[in-house]
Amino acid sequence: MSLLRCRFQALPSLCFCVLVLACIVACQLQMPPGTQSPPPEPKSHWSQVQSKVKELVEPLVTKTRERWQWLWGPGPFQGFLQTYYHDHLKDLGPRTKAWLRSSKDGLLNKAQSLCPRLLCGDKDQD
């Protein structure tokens, strides 16, 4: 049972490592076409692991980028901003003024109720 618990605790770390590797591969794939790649290094165990991970992750990154390309276009983002503005920000000025006015009135009423009658006087005398 404890072995199973250890596996579940290690899962977020593993997912994070895979995500970092995917980002690295994606950044390497986005190099401009005229740039030269670094000279090949002698094959070590680590470079073999790196190349194998790159070979496995590269298709996933490419597919994900192609599937989510519509989200980064100007249409959906602009539509989201317009909807957000109309829903939340369009009448922000009048709402803010009304809130400030009611807050000011509330604070003045509290201050007058706390003020001793000798200093502030009675309201009935005005």
From Swiss-Prot:
One GO term under biological process is:
lipid transport
The protein's UniProt keywords, in alphabetical order, are: Lipid transport, Secreted, Signal, Transport
Per the record, a Pfam family? APOC4
Its main subcellular localisation, reduced to a broad class, is secreted
* Compartments where found: Secreted
Q: Secretion signal: which residues?
A: 1-27
Gene Ontology cellular-component terms listed: high-density lipoprotein particle; very-low-density lipoprotein particle
This molecule's function is given as: May participate in lipoprotein metabolism.
What is the recorded name of this protein? Apolipoprotein C-IV
Organism of origin is Otolemur garnettii
Question: Lineage of this protein's species?
Answer: Eukaryota, Metazoa, Chordata, Craniata, Vertebrata
Gene this chain is encoded by: APOC4
